[in-house]
Amino acid sequence: MHHPEAPASQAPASPSLDPAALVSRLRATFAGGRTRPLAWREQQLTQLRSLFTEHREDIADALYADLRKPRSEAYTTEVDFPVREIDHTLAHLEEWLSPQPLASGALAGLPEGSTAGTQYEPLGTVLIIAPWNYPVQLLLVPLVGALAAGNAVVLKPSEITPATSELIARLIPEYLDTDAVAVVEGGVPETTALLAQRYDHIFYTGNGAVGRIVMRAAAEHLTPVTLELGGKSPVFVDRGVDVAAVATRLAEAKFRNAGQTCVAPDYVLTDPDTASVLAKELRTAVERVFSADPKSSETYGRIVNERHFDRVSALLGSGTTAFGGQSDRDDVYIAPTVLTDVRPDEPVMREEIFGPVLPIVNVDGLDEAIAFINDRDKPLALYVFTESGTTRERIAAETSSGAVGYGLPLAHLTVSDLPFGGVGESGMGSYHGRYSMETFSHRKAVLAKPLS
């Protein structure tokens, strides 16, 4: 989800943090049965909803302090989206949790009167580790699933967004059961200390390098993991499409949050003629969405810090700059930038960009685009603009990605009834809606035959 450099924090672990005691306390709560009743789960979710609605402005203020995130964007992605997830979960939770009996025909080999089915049980005590790019949503939407499933939860917000982390650490104890939900702030030492403990599930959103660290720690206790990672999400633009419409949708999806979105379009594959028109239309679309001067626009964000600014800035030399390219380190500002005639071996194509830079790579057509995509790690998302049903069928059948979107990038993650997650290097496991509850649950087989 964020760039594969772990924070270079050398600070000692907080002397007040006793991870073993913390996890032990939460385990005791879970063992006592407190988190299992449906009423407790619904009450916690309702309280979490109140946290969002009563502190909407505080959340937006913290996100602006940390990320210069525009208020409208903060409301949409970090308040309204989690509230919709909570509402969807509350509306369906009792139905999701109800035991699922097998049809009698499935029990033909068993004694008469036998019944069987499945039911969900909570896993126990879980750890959720969030990144900095959507520091509220990516911490608290997984929490919705963990609470819905009836677990005790340790939350670890990102230290790279300190104002948001501090706000969450202050508000969670005011709204949620402090014997069942705890927030631990801090950097690498605190996270390392937390990972040394035994959990019943670990949910991590971030980069693959740290994902491997999380998975190694989990292996010590045979703890299952969900890894929501990232990668270079490609866009294929077919010949003959409405390029102006494509440009508008790409500009919105790519440059919101200054490109710091795990499923943002990373690069474009298209033929040279379409590439030339697309670059011009993207300039028009960017000016329409973010004004001719995005630096002074209230709708355009900033890079999270100088380290990530330096990393993204180093990618600006690839290809030919069609427009953009301006930057200001003191303001951690990089303009929306489109690069054309980019070669596959250039720096901008070697890593997830995670910034407002969109390279366009020329391909001859669909066959070459599919080969290009399949020659690289499986992405978190793949986007296609085409009018051809055959092209859509071939993309679905001949490529692998966490999700595929035809015509509307990013939209799939807003649909609660769709699983959100990666495959291969882009992650494992999924969540949102019912899938969140299932991620934090064990689906247990139950069979019964009366003795009389």
Please annotate each region the language model reported.
Residues A28-R34, I128, V235-V237, Y267-T270, ...:
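Short, well-ordered beta-strand elements within core beta-sheets of diverse protein domains
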Residues F30, R34, R49-F52, R56, ...:
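Structural signal for hydrophobic packing residues in well-ordered secondary-structure cores
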Residues Q10-P12, A209-R343, Y406:
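ALDH superfamily catalytic-core signature
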Residues G105-A245, S276, V363:
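Rossmann-like NAD(P) dinucleotide-binding subdomain of oxidoreductase/dehydrogenase enzymes
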Residues P19, L38, R56, V243, ...:
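Residues at or immediately preceding the N-termini of alpha-helices
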Residues R41, I86, G150, V181, ...:
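Residue-level signal for inorganic ion chemistry
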Residues M1-T115:
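N-terminal Rossmann-like NAD(P)+-binding subdomain of aldehyde/semialdehyde dehydrogenases
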Residues H2, P37, Y333-S452:
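Conserved C-terminal structural/oligomerization subdomain of aldehyde/semialdehyde dehydrogenase
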